[in-house]
């Protein structure tokens, strides 16, 4: 009998001054059940001006490579830099505020799926108890079973918790022109679709532990909308993006002019209501459309 094929999984974590101890401990639990023909490495890329106080402890305790970029690289560039530093056959990208729901089986589930897939998305979960706007919106929009995500596999791609063959990623990496928060995974999923890469969705969720205040979350939402507008102008996004599709309908019917007026009249009030404790997904979606209507949007042409 021939020797079994050896595979290596590189866990890639982009962070900004986050305490990654709980995530590393969860990964350690998963290592115990890792198939015998798989090995593991962990790489963290930190863009905070100051190195993590626990960096030396992490490197010793969890045998990880800690990359510090005090001048910042941007979200896409940071992930790409981590990937280039990796030595694995496959990459597992986890956000810094992710925590596997089932740590004992988390890595094994990915290893099994990657044998027959180039890109695998595990899914998002939220712990019960929090009533923050971020968690309310997340539970309604991001907690989607794998069989539902599979219906539109590329549109439902999320960079929060996914694995990919390293060879595929190096050909189709994150767009480094996006420096700030928002829609980098939307663009990445679309690029995979254009490249005819199959995206496989499985039930292998991680909790999203984001603890942003309501105001911080809306600030991030504003930034994400601004990023989306820039992508539209550059011709990098098509109408499979739901918010863009809705906006295009408003443009075609002329209703976008009404939205511009409503933005002046309502946007600040809606923001105050959302920060003040009102938990309405419909109102949040309206807030995003109003933010978008504040831009002069000329649809760019994609250059293939």
Please give the residue ranges for each predicted region.
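Acidic donor-binding segment of Leloir-type glycosyltransferases
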Residues: 27-68
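Conserved donor NDP-sugar-binding/catalytic core segment of glycosyltransferases
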Residues: 99-134
């Amino acid at each position: 009998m021939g020797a079994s094929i050896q595979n290596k999984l590189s866990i890639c974590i982009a962070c900004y001054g986050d305490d990654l101890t709980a995530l590393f401990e969860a990964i350690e639990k998963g290592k115990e059940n890792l198939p015998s023909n798989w090995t593991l490495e962990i790489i963290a890329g930190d863009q905070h001006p100051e190195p993590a106080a626990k960096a030396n402890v992490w490197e010793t305790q969890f045998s990880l490579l800690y990359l510090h970029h005090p001048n910042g690289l941007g979200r896409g560039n940071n992930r790409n830099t981590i990937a280039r530093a990796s030595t694995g056959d496959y990459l597992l990208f986890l956000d810094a505020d992710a925590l596997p729901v089932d740590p004992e089986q988390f890595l094994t589930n990915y290893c099994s799926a990657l044998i027959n897939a180039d890109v695998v998305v595990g899914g998002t979960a939220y712990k019960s108890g929090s009533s923050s706007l971020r968690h309310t919106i997340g539970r309604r929009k991001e907690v989607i079973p794998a069989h539902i995500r599979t219906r539109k596999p590329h549109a439902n791609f999320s960079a929060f918790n996914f694995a990919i063959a390293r060879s595929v990623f190096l050909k189709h990496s994150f767009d480094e022109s996006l420096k700030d928060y928002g829609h980098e995974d939307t663009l990445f999923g679309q690029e995979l679709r254009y490249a005819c890469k199959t995206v496989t969705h499985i039930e292998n969720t991680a909790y999203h532990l984001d603890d942003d205040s309501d105001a911080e979350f809306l600030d991030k939402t504003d930034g994400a909308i601004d990023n989306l507008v820039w992508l539209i102008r550059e011709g990098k996004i098509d109408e499979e993006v739901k918010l863009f599709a809705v906006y295009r309908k408003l443009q075609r019917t002329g209703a976008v002019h009404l939205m511009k007026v409503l933005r002046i009249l309502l946007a600040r009030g809606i923001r105050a209501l959302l920060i003040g404790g009102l938990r309405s997904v419909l109102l949040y979606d309206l807030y995003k459309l109003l933010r978008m209507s504040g831009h002069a949007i000329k649809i760019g042409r994609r250059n293939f």
